Amino acid sequence: MKIAERIPKPDFMEEAEWDLLMKTRAPEIIRLGARAHVQTYRESNGEGDTYLTQGAPTLLLTTIGRISGTEQTMPANFLQDGDDVYVVGSIAGLDRHPHWALNLDTKPKAWIQIKADHYEVDVKRLVGDDRAAVWPVLTEFFPLWGHFQKYCDREFMVFKLNRKAS
């Protein structure tokens, strides 16, 4: 897999923060970091250092593996707007979609944990005009999504999640 090495530092980040992000964006490092993040998030119910990643809130997203058929849990940055929760499959601008996004696209069944609140969600992938309408809001909230998208050949998948009616 090719990793875009020459993504310039955005103006909104400090040099040291950007350097660390660039050093840790290899898939193997992301995978190991995600496992540790899931464990500490669950233990703390998302309190303390586990809630914010790169300055944006983090949830735990559990999907059904499109190949394995088993539950897979990953941390993901999100934007909550009322009852709507948005997640973006950016994976730091790597040249492939994150597994969780491919899982949601193939099997739109998921659960999320935001701090101590766990619930099943309805999943809708936003494409075309629906994606275009929300993209400026998402990138204003978390500028890294927009910055990485500028330097990535693939279009990041965007999903809207809503609490499943009981």
Where are these regions (language model features)?
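Short strand-connecting beta-turns/loops that link adjacent beta-strands
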Residues: 81-83, 117, 166
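Short, structured beta-strand-loop surface elements
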Residues: 2, 8-21, 91-144, 151-154, ...
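Short helix-to-loop capping/linker segments positioned immediately adjacent to catalytic or ligand/cofactor-binding
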Residues: 48-49, 145-149
